[in-house]
């Protein structure tokens, strides 16, 4: 899911943090494997929304996409490493269960769309039912290892492992192009630099975006803990979003209350005040209903002859009651609308919202220390797996293996920024005082004093006259 609205906030309040670059040539990049596999699964489908299969009925689209996309990355002078998710944190189980519910709902709606809907409806609902399974991951890991591409299985979140590799200077982090995606979690895991829109598709030519965390923290936030607070408030994968909080209001709240702790306290107090006000309105409304149900106290006294005057009284009372009743109903409806407006609008924080646990995951994520190594592809293994088992074209597989051997084994041309480092400008030296010669080097105060004494002694000895005997 990512961090909602973070890209827009950085563009507005920390524009120096985002810049466009033309190429990642000569870089080593870490790629979130699950996200990539998911995109390949939903990319090409049949008219009925089902996945493309081979002659044996097996789904192979994700393997084909991973094989050829990785080839294009390598051909562009980039060395990729794929990071796979491990066991999800306990805090994420609630989000995963809700995703499962949404997939089941989409499956039912998709079946209805096949009967009454359009092709677009069927495709839309079928995309929502896609899930990356353990079998998908295992087959992709096998393919990548045969290609000579490093595979890292994270102990927990793949984004956290990517950030660890990036902090160690082993890789940069790159994301494939994904329309409308806000996959910025890696920054919250303290990744120094994130590259987005990594694509080599002719139909989706778009410059690569580089997001620099250090530049982002020099904007309106100034500290990494505050940045984490903002990301959690915007909405992350571990907590339900707070209704009524958008990017602008989130930044305003963080600034006003100094962090997420103060924001949560403020929202809790506000919710308690609204709840008390709502209870008071309901109590007043109940007392009004009780008064309406009580009989009029003078009705028995003013009717000595119940038979005759009851008929006349009914004729006279009907118009009065018909006029009075709507007023009371109108007043009660206004009260209900007022009560509904108080309880249903504004910012609403869930009763259970363990933001402290989410912050711990971002500050101290689970990761492993790994060295990455790119090796020669196993050509025979690729032919056995892709051609004999999955029905791929043998000529294309062998040509792809040749490209891998060529680009992975060739000595990679270095980047200029690998030879030079930017240094801050040194302050200009103060001009020497008039009448004193400029020395060629730096002489400390002690050396200067010693030299001055030697010069004075030489001058005095030269000016002395010899003594007469």
Curated annotation (Swiss-Prot):
Mg(2+) 2 binds at residues 183, 185, 237. GO terms for biological process: base-excision repair; DNA replication, removal of RNA primer. Residues 121-257 are annotated as: I-domain. One of its GO terms (molecular function) is 5'-flap endonuclease activity. Keywords: DNA damage, DNA repair, DNA replication, Endonuclease, Exonuclease, Hydrolase, Magnesium, Metal-binding, Mitochondrion, Nuclease, Nucleus, Phosphoprotein. Its EC number is 3.1.-.-. InterPro entries: 5-3_exonuclease_C_sf, Flap_endonuc, HhH2, PIN-like_dom_sf, XPG-I_dom, XPG/Rad2, XPG_CS, XPG_DNA_repair_N. Residues 326-342 have a biased composition (Basic residues). Phosphorylated. Phosphorylation upon DNA damage induces relocalization to the nuclear plasma. Residues 412-420 are annotated as: Interaction with PCNA. Residues 282-295, 302-317 have a biased composition (Acidic residues). It is found in: Nucleus, Nucleolus; Nucleus, Nucleoplasm; Mitochondrion. Coiled coil: none annotated. Residues 274-354, 424-469 are annotated as: Disordered. GO terms for cellular component: mitochondrion; nucleolus; nucleoplasm. Mg(2+) 1 binds at residues 32, 85, 157, 159. DNA binds at residues 45, 69, 157, 235, 237. Residues 441-459 have a biased composition (Basic and acidic residues). Its cofactor is Mg(2+). It is an enzyme of class 3 (hydrolase). Binds 2 magnesium ions per subunit. They probably participate in the reaction catalyzed by the enzyme. May bind an additional third magnesium ion after substrate binding. Belongs to the XPG/RAD2 endonuclease family. FEN1 subfamily. This is Flap endonuclease 1-B. The gene is FEN12.
């Amino acid at each position: 899911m990512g961090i909602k609205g973070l890209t827009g906030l950085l563009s507005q309040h920390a524009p120096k943090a985002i810049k466009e670059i033309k190429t990642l040539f000569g870089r080593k990049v870490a790629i979130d494997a699950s996200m990539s596999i998911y995109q390949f699964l939903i990319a090409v489908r049949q008219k009925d929304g089902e996945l493309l299969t081979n002659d044996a009925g097996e789904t192979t689209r994700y393997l084909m996409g991973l094989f050829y996309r990785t080839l294009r990355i390598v051909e562009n002078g980039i060395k990729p490493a794929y990071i796979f998710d491990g066991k999800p944190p306990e805090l994420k189980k609630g989000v995963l269960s809700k995703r499962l519910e949404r997939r089941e709902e989409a499956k039912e709606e998709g079946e209805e769309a096949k009967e009454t809907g359009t092709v677009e409806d069927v495709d839309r609902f079928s995309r929502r039912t896609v899930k990356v399974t353990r079998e998908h991951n295992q087959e992709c890991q096998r393919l990548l290892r045969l290609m000579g591409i490093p595979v890292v299985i994270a102990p927990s979140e793949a984004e956290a492992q990517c950030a660890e590799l990036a902090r160690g200077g082993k890789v940069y982090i790159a994301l494939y192009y994904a329309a409308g995606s806000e996959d910025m979690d890696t920054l919250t895991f303290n990744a120094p630099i994130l590259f987005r829109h990594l694509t080599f598709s002719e139909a989706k030519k778009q410059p690569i975006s580089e997001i620099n965390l250090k530049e982002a923290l020099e904007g309106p936030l100034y500290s990494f803990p505050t940045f984490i607070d903002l990301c959690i408030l915007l909405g992350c994968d571990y907590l339900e979003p707070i209704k009524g909080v958008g990017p602008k209001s989130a930044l305003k709240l963080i600034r006003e209350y100094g962090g997420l702790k103060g924001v949560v306290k403020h929202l809790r107090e506000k919710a308690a005040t609204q709840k008390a006000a709502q209870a008071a309105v309901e109590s007043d409304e109940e007392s009004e209903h009780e008064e309406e149900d009580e009989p009029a106290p003078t009705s028995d006294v003013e009717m000595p002859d119940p038979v005759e005057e009851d008929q006349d009284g009914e004729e006279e009372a009907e118009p009065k009651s018909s006029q009075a009743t709507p007023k009371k109903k109108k007043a009660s409806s206004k009260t209900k609308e007022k009560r509904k407006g108080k309880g249903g609008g504004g910012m609403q924080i869930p009763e259970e919202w363990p933001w402290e646990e989410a912050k711990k995951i971002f500050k101290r994520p689970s990761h492993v220390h790994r060295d990455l190594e790119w090796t020669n592809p196993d050509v025979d293994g690729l032919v056995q797996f892709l051609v004999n088992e999955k029905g791929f074209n043998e000529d294309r597989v062998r040509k792809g293996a040749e490209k891998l051997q060529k680009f992975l084994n060739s000595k990679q041309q270095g980047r200029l920024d690998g030879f030079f480092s930017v240094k801050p400008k040194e302050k200009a030296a103060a001009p020497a005082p008039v009448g004193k010669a400029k020395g060629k080097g730096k002489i400390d105060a002690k050396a200067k004093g010693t030299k001055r004494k030697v010069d004075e002694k030489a001058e005095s000895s030269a000016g002395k006259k010899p003594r007469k005997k």
